[in-house]
A protein has these predicted regions:
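Residue-level signature of catalytic and energy-coupling elements of molecular machines
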Residues: 10, 31, 50, 69, ...
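Juxtamembrane helix-loop transition segments at the membrane interface in multi-pass membrane proteins
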Residues: 27-41, 213-232, 540-545
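Cytosolic catalytic headpiece
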Residues: 41-42, 55, 232-454, 487-490
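Membrane-embedded alpha-helical bundles of multi-pass transporters
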Residues: 4, 8, 221, 383-384, ...
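A short beta-strand structural signal in non-transmembrane regions
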Residues: 124-130, 350, 388, 471
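Bilayer-spanning, highly hydrophobic alpha-helical transmembrane segments
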Residues: 156-185, 194-215, 497-526
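Actuator/coupling domain of P-type ATPases
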Residues: 1-49, 53, 65-72, 79, ...
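Conserved cytosolic headpiece of P-type ATPases
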Residues: 50, 61, 70, 82-83, ...
Length: 545
């Protein structure tokens, strides 16, 4: 445009436009750099140095040079540089950078300490368990930085649009400069000027710069709230989720089993039933066994236990001193021809028999997480059409949890492969164009996470398996983080659409004005650089979400 202005003899305008354009480009570059720095700072959880004890001395070195098994010292106000286990010291850790939670977490000797957490109160001596590159902070930042390589459909559309749009407007600008003088016989100077004005206005920078920046900012804003999104394609997919399928245990419920009732029979007391159950389960590592032993709460003399047999799918039989104890489900009672009373309450039931006589039943339940019910309500409020729960537990447990949380559907007594089948069935029924998300623990649900449009793993903090398995990782065990993720996704898409409308709308008006000779080169530069700055500043709003 500047060359064109020189050609047609508009020397002052040529110089002025060049200066104005450079000023505009400077502010545009400044806005883009600042926005990217804001996002990078948001995710800057990697410490620059580590204090290591070597040969009886404390030295400060780069975290990359610390080996696994070395002792590091972290003072109050310092970030933990590598993952490890606390050898000595008590402190409160600010985990906000990893989880988005403002409530500090207390750590003591033997507790896990994750890199990226800010030490607040006491001096900690930590034995490293992972190298710097494999530590939590490094993995999180690598995931977020690599997320830009997975582009959203809207980003791909803008890239494709710009590929065709640019040559088209160049041709139109050439036609505008050449055809009217030839056809209408008018002077060349005015139409060449209009052609260059048209060309400057039509530059697609506002879209090409602001749209990817908005998605990058959305991923940064999500990470600030303890949600890792592995790509802008998944962020946009979250915006279109209409069906969310939850695994039950560890997702909607705590996954911690507790004895909630003991129903004795045939003259046995509650204490006797619990003691017999504890004797039977004393060698088992199953969560049900642990809950019974925790409820018993006494030291178990395992020397009196003999002839221990674990009967797969049925239960356990043992000799406890002179007593023959059976502990298991109704199938075990039926197999041993023991008459028993069926417990109708919802929960996991352990039936007990001693020396062939039915002794009673122990009821064990998994507690629903405090924020699960509100999460389901909030999801429906922000536009999720259907919430579904899948569980391997029996029908009564599934129904009880589903009714308590007011879920739309539930499916119980499912094996892992059956969960995949149910997700495929639900996927086929969802609204056309919408997405299905599955939320699980990221460890036992890998096949279902892979099958869903968006796989969401919960409790990713310190869990490599969860981070690897899913498209979106909720760093804590709170279901409410899912609402945060979708809200950020919707806000991101809203800003993207605003920028598209702003850029195309303003440019369309200025293109018409330029073609008619109403808009000059000053307006043209604003129509390009000015609109880009407006779009970039609008994109920055996502960091406030």
């Amino acid at each position: 445009s500047t060359i064109g202005a020189f050609v047609i003899g508009e020397y002052p305008e040529a110089v002025a436009v060049m200066l104005f354009y450079q000023v505009g480009e400077f502010f545009q570059s400044l806005a883009v750099k600042r926005s990217r720095k804001s996002i990078s700072d948001l995710m800057d959880i990697r410490p620059d140095s580590a204090t290591v004890r070597r040969n009886g001395k404390l030295i400060t070195i780069s975290p990359e040079n610390v080996s696994i098994g070395e002792i590091i010292i972290v003072k109050p106000g310092e970030k933990i540089p590598l993952d490890g286990v606390v050898l000595d010291g008590d402190s409160m850790l600010d985990t906000r950078a990893l989880t988005g939670e403002s409530v500090p977490r207390s750590v003591h000797k033997g507790d896990e300490a994750l890199s990226g957490c800010m030490n607040q109160t006491g001096v900690l001596m930590i034995k490293t368990t992972k190298a710097f590159g494999e530590s939590t902070a490094s993995k999180i930042i690598d995931l977020v930085e690599n997320a830009s390589s997975r582009k959203a459909p809207t980003e791909n559309f803008i890239t494709t649009f710009a590929r065709y749009y640019t040559p088209v407007v160049v041709i139109l600008a050439a036609f505008l400069a050449i055809l009217p003088p030839i056809i209408l016989g008018e002077g060349w100077t005015e139409w060449i000027r209009r052609g260059f004005v048209f060309l400057v206005i039509s530059c697609p920078c506002a879209l090409v710069i602001s749209i990817p920046l908005t998605f990058f900012g959305g991923i940064g804003a999500a990470s600030k709230r303890g949600v890792l999104v592995k790509g802008s394609n998944y962020l946009e997919a979250l915006n279109n989720v209409s069906v969310i399928v939850f695994d039950k245990t560890g997702t909607l419920t705590k996954g911690v089993f507790n004895v909630t009732d003991i129903l004795p029979a045939n003259g046995f007391s509650k204490e006797q039933v619990l003691e017999c159950a504890a004797e039977a389960e004393s060698f088992s590592n199953h969560p049900i066994a642990k809950s019974i032993l925790a409820a018993y709460g006494k030291e178990m003399d395992q020397s009196v236990i003999s002839d221990y047999k674990e009967i797969s799918g049925y239960g356990i039989s043992v000799m406890a001193g002179e007593k023959k104890v059976f502990a298991g489900n109704t199938k075990l009672m039926d197999t041993e021809c023991i008459e028993y009373t069926t417990c109708e309450k919802a929960g996991t039931k352990v039936y007990l028999a001693v020396d062939g006589q039915y002794a009673g039943c122990i009821l064990i339940t998994d507690e629903v997480k405090p924020d699960s019910k509100k999460t389901i309500s909030d999801l429906k409020h922000i536009g999720v059409e259907k919430t579904v729960m899948l569980t391997g537990d029996d029908e009564k447990i599934g129904k009880s949890v589903a009714e308590e949380l007011q879920l739309d559907e539930y499916y119980a007594q499912l094996l892992p492969d059956q969960k995949v089948e149910k997700v495929e069935l639900l996927d086929g029924k969802k609204r056309p164009g919408s997405k299905l998300a599955f939320v699980g623990d990221g460890i036992n649900d890998a096949p279902v996470l892979a099958r869903a449009d968006v796989g969401i793993a919960m409790g990713g903090l310190g869990s490599d398996a969860a981070i690897e398995a899913a498209d979106v990782v909720l760093m804590t065990d709170e279901p409410s983080k899912l609402v945060d993720a979708i809200e950020v996704a919707k806000a991101t898409k809203q800003i993207v659409m605003q920028n598209i409308v702003i850029a195309l709308g303003i440019k369309s008006v200025f293109l018409i004005l330029g073609a008619l000779g109403i808009a000059g080169m000053w307006e043209a530069v604003f129509g390009d650089v000015g609109v880009t700055i407006i779009a970039v500043l609008n994109a920055m709003r996502i960091l406030k979400k």
